[in-house]
Amino acid sequence: MKLGIYLNAQHPAADDPARRFAETIEQVRLIRSLGFDSIWGGEHHITPGFHYFPLLPMLQRLAAEADGMWLGTNLVLLPLHNPVEIAEVAAFLDVISGGRFMLGVGLGYRTEEFAMFRVPMKERVSRLTEGVEIIRRLWTEDHVTHHGRHWQLDDVTIRPRPIQRPRPPILVGSQVDAGIARAARIADGWLVVPIPTVDEIAAQSKAYAATRASAGLPPSDHVCRIIEVVCAPDEDTALRRAAPFLLEKYAAYLAWGMPGITIDKNAAPEEQLRQLAKNRFALGSPAQVTDALLAQHRAGVTHATMRVGWPGMAQKDVLAGIELLGREVLPEVRRRAAQARA
């Protein structure tokens, strides 16, 4: 099981963005020093009340700080973009990371974003599938000609190419059955959102693997899930530390139309988070977080992308969580996962 950190790129609009990005650099340096496998980020646009750092430029800046770690996108909203540009930028990220880049893409779900880019939401599936095909070909072929529904290419070659051979992994995100089956067929891996419970992930992972097998494809090494992780000396401290920020994050998800979330507004904040986290997040002491991550692994997750900071959270608390994860959880998860394989 690989263990990475999903970087928070969303910050309150009142915060100084330069300070918040300097804090991100500090986090990445600590993440690298503790031996994590990867760093990840996501993409959104038009986020009222928040800064949201642009994904690909952010990873380009962080590549040098992350030397030796993998970089991943979770995820690029591919229907909003020209796939040729994404192929070029992603290839360059592979070059500057030393061949340690994974391209994660997905449909998107916010109507505001599609309206801003003047892309009809009804076209998002066809744009995604066509875009993945174009990127794959541009990474592995010269003189690509493609005449599809959305994109017309005549004799296109990109340089530089990725340095991974045959190419970087392409992962597709979804939380619905049709999208998971699509990810199994057209991509190398599946990006899992943090919403489903562990039991739901286990069932979805089996369906994903069965779809790949029926298509004559090998098992995937890239089932990557965002997991909300709050590691503290004890569960009560974890709940108190994270509740104001995680609950605001999930309230934003609700406002943006993310399905699958319910929050009991009548409960106290810590109890709201306890209910939301049950069988879904990894929250509590190092031992509790270790057990929760291993439960995700047993459910089929091969790469945990752990989100440890949320909008408005103090840097000292983010760093403390990363430090505790790296010192106490990382080695124990790796040891027990290796034992389970033996």
What are these regions (language model features)?
Residues 2-19, 79-150, 190-202, 241, ...:
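Flexible, glycine-rich active-site loops centered on histidine and acidic residues
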